[in-house]
């Protein structure tokens, strides 16, 4: 029988805040690897005084049947997905975000329940809202102009792009949506946005004060960066390596920021509650 009910591994302030929420519901929790920030580490250690803090991933996994990871689940220097794969057993239920497809397939083959937070539409939408708000906050923090009446370009009109565009429009920004999809452009137009075909990005890039990228593909390359306004601020919220050539941006003195994990940075407590509620509803 496992010594603890839930092992919380890796992640950021969101996973740190999940610990006391689990405990409030009567679960014993052991933690490992919540090291994104000193605040998160302190929060986790404080919240599990009555439970435990593992000295290794193996100890955490062996100690509980429910494993809750961060978003993303795998984090260099904190959680190696290959090591986790070697340690988990059929008795485990795994939760985390942006879980590699190969890991999820392996879990399926081994009859291990594996739930990706970001495959749950309600969580993904909640995450997109927090990401959009965080992107706007980053823009305000790093540029000394108003968003009101600013010429703002949003690249991509998926879940994040739609919500971000709408929130910028609500702040009276002059929003243009750029996409390679005619359907996305038509939808953006229907919601009152200006639109720009992706193949015109280089030609029009210099017209904008703020550029928000949501597409995880190398769209903002050196050629596009060369055309940008010298005072532009690029906020890249795309996952993985993002969508900006950061080496070229530095050489061209274009202010570009890759802003990952914004919900964990600015909306950690409410995000943690959302994730906790999902886990508790599925164990």
Residue ranges with predicted function:
Residues 57, 72-93, 188-264:
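Rossmann-like adenosine-cofactor binding region
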Residues 26-44, 171-191:
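NAD(P)-binding Rossmann-fold cofactor-contacting core
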Residues 1-105, 114, 278, 282-283:
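N-terminal ligand-binding/catalytic initiation module
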Residues 7-17, 148-168:
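Glycine-rich adenosine-cofactor-binding loop
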Residues 121-140:
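A glycine-rich, Thr/Ser-enriched phosphate-binding loop motif common to dinucleotide/cofactor-binding enzymes
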Residues 98-115, 237-281:
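Rossmann-fold NAD(P)-binding glycine/threonine-rich loop
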Residues 1, 136-146:
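A short, basic/flexible loop-to-alpha-helix module at the beginning of a structural domain
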């Amino acid at each position: 029988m496992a010594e603890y009910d839930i092992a919380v591994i890796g992640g950021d302030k969101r996973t740190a805040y999940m610990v006391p929420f689990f405990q409030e519901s009567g679960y014993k929790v052991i933690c490992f690897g919540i090291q994104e920030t000193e605040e998160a580490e302190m929060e986790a250690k404080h919240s599990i005084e009555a439970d435990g803090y593992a000295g290794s991933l193996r100890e955490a996994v062996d100690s509980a049947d429910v494993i809750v990871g961060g978003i993303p689940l795998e984090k260099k220097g904190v959680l190696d997905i290959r090591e986790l794969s070697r340690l988990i057993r059929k008795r485990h239920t795994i939760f985390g975000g942006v879980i590699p497809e190969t890991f999820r397939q392996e879990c399926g083959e081994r009859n291990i329940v594996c739930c990706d937070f970001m495959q749950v539409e309600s969580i993904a939408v909640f995450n997109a809202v927090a990401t959009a708000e965080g992107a706007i906050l980053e823009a305000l923090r790093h540029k000394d102009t108003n968003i009101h009446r600013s010429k703002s370009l949003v690249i991509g009109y998926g879940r994040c792009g739609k919500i971000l565009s709408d929130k910028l429009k609500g702040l009276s920004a002059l929003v243009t949506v750029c996409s390679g999809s005619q359907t996305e452009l038509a939808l953006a137009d229907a919601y009152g946005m200006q639109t720009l075909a992706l193949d015109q990005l280089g030609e029009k890039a210099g017209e904008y004060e703020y550029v928000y990228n949501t597409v995880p593909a190398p769209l903002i390359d050196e050629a596009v960066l060369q055309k940008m306004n010298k005072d532009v601020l690029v906020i890249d919220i795309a996952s993985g390596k993002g969508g900006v050539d950061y080496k070229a941006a530095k050489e061209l003195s274009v202010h570009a920021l890759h802003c990952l994990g914004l919900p964990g940075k600015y909306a950690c407590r409410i995000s943690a509650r959302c994730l906790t509620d999902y886990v508790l509803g599925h164990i």
